[in-house]
């Protein structure tokens, strides 16, 4: 009986180890949920060409509309007052008076920087995908649609830089996600870049109202021309 039990244990140990390592491998060998798979994408399937554009809209909605970041911008004009007591969220009081030296550790300002560059990074990836789709397009209508989609993405990238340059002045101008050596560009260069991007958007976006778009609410020529 003892020998039988010993044999069963010796047989069970490697089996259990095999199952354990196999299940762990299956569990761990997965792409992170926030990772977009770039291998194996069929860029000849033009029906999927809008997918990277849709991702930029989702990113812009989540990262450019933050109340905390937006507050840093609007309190600097005459449209909105901070309100509340003088000590309530006093950082917005500093922002309204352009006292940026007192905002170096303000979490909302740091968040706006990160949010805008996340939109830039997402836009760069989307534009790279659109370029890959464009290589396989043959009809003029499809090429025009590809240019329109690129214009939608470039609008959001330009808008992110509009926020950055207005709050920080000189900022790095990143036009792709491959750049390793990053340096600040002058405020004048960034603003010229924004104007050039908007010119491209105006030339390639449809002259319709947003509710008339194939994707209702999408940016149009009039959005870029405002």
Where do the language-model regions lie?
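Short linear capping/connector segments at secondary-structure termini
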Residues: 34-38, 139-143, 173-180
């Amino acid at each position: 009986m003892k020998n039988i039990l010993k044999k069963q244990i010796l047989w069970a140990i490697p089996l259990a180890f095999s199952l354990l390592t196999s299940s762990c491998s299956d569990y761990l060998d997965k792409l992170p949920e926030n990772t977009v798979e770039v291998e194996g994408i069929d860029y000849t399937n033009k029906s999927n060409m809008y997918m990277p554009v849709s991702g930029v809209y989702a990113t812009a909605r989540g990262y450019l509309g933050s109340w905390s970041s937006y507050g840093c911008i609007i309190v600097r004009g005459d449209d909105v007052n901070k309100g509340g007591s003088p000590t309530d969220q006093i950082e917005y009081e500093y922002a309204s008076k352009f006292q940026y030296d007192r905002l170096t550790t303000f979490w909302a300002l740091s968040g706006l920087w990160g949010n805008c560059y996340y939109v830039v990074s997402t836009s760069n990836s989307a534009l790279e995908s659109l370029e890959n789709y464009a290589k396989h397009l043959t009809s003029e209508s499809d090429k025009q649609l590809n240019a329109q989609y690129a214009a939608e993405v470039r609008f959001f990238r330009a808008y992110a830089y509009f926020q950055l340059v207005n709050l920080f002045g000189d900022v790095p101008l990143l036009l792709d996600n491959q750049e390793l050596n990053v340096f600040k560009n002058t405020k004048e260069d960034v603003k010229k870049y924004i104007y050039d991007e908007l010119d491209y958007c105006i030339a390639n976006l449809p002259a319709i109202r947003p509710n008339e778009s194939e994707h209702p609410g999408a940016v149009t020529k009039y959005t870029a021309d405002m």
